Swiss-Prot record:
One of its GO terms (cellular component) is membrane. DOMON domain could bind catecholamines and thereby could regulate the cytochrome b561 domain function. DOMON domain could bind one heme b. This is Cytochrome b561 and DOMON domain-containing protein At5g35735. The chain crosses the membrane at residues 210-230, 241-261, 280-300, 316-336, 349-369. One of its GO terms (molecular function) is metal ion binding. Its cofactor is heme b. It comes from Arabidopsis thaliana. InterPro entries: AIR12_DOMON, Cyt_b561/ferric_Rdtase_TM, DOMON_domain, UCP037471. Residues 1-25 form the signal peptide.
Amino acid sequence: MDRTQSPKTALFAVLATLLVLTVNGQSLCNTHRFTNNLAFADCSDLSALGSFLHWTYNEQNGTVSIAYRHPGTSASSWVAWGLNPSSTQMVGTQALVAFTNTTTNQFQAYTSSVSSYGTRLERSSLSFGVSGLSATLVSGEVTIFATLELSPNLITANQLWQVGPVVNGVPASHQTSGDNMRSSGRIDFRTGQASAGGGGSGDRLRKRNTHGVLNAVSWGVLMPMGAMMARYMKVFADPTWFYLHIAFQVSGYVIGVAGWATGIKLGNDSPGTSYSTHRNLGIALFTFATLQVFALLVRPKPDHKYRTYWNVYHHTVGYTTIILSIVNIFKGFDILDPEDKWRWAYIGILIFLGACVLILEPLTWFIVLRRKSRGGNTVAAPTSSKYSNGVNGTTTTGPHHQDA
């Protein structure tokens, strides 16, 4: 090797290294040139999804001209960027949305105020003025342009950006993992500072999922199964049915209270967001279930003159709780908007429980009537009077009068 080439080679390597470090140290948004010769005072490489935000803040009139860029987009995807004045979650976000209109085959932009987790990004006005809204899709890169008329409390705000599929001409749910759950942060249009959101939205999603699972299992599965134990097992085994009934109901109540508490926590963490029907049904369920628990403490003896009234109360509140719980679980599905498989999985559980009822109801009546025709008790002989619900601890007229 020619030794005279070594210094030149070393110098070239050093220069190449410095060039790479310089390019890597320079914000990618600073190197972008817009085809329409627009120029912006500040820009930020956003922390997720490979997106960029360019803006110019006009302090005199309180407006911000922005350009949001998202590369690697297909014609069957939607892209959105927005501000949330109260939190880093999706609900409450004032968004700019862009995707290809399948009817006109034109790439369009519009505004959408996100009011629920099941949103389809419907067109709606925002809490602040927007002018000059437009969007382009060039070589797989979406750019949304707009001028925002911001109040002082929005000069520093939470920003969120997202991408998802378009299905049948309508924006569908985005992915709930990876960068899609990290695409939020803070933006200060005046100072030009932007920071990552720290994954808060992912934590909220986990809390919502936990809330949904706890309530679906407790109110939607364990409670109905506990009622079925009391209604259908009593003719076969006493006091086994009683212990199973109590075990299912108490387990359902404990898990349900945990789910209810997570719902309260989610509500407190989401100011300005309210699902009044879902919340009110949840409060009613908690109240009814708590009344059922305390009712057990004042349950009259089987031969007490008020036992019949207690049974009517216990049945009415119990079945009302089960019906309301199923209704509220589907309300929760509408709010959380999970993949369809979860909704269908719960529907499958309800169908299974319903099939069990259709089989056990006539079977129970058959056993009750046969025992009655033979002059015997309609329930299995109890080992203790505390498990019996008939008048004076003897027979009942059928399964409708049985309870814990």
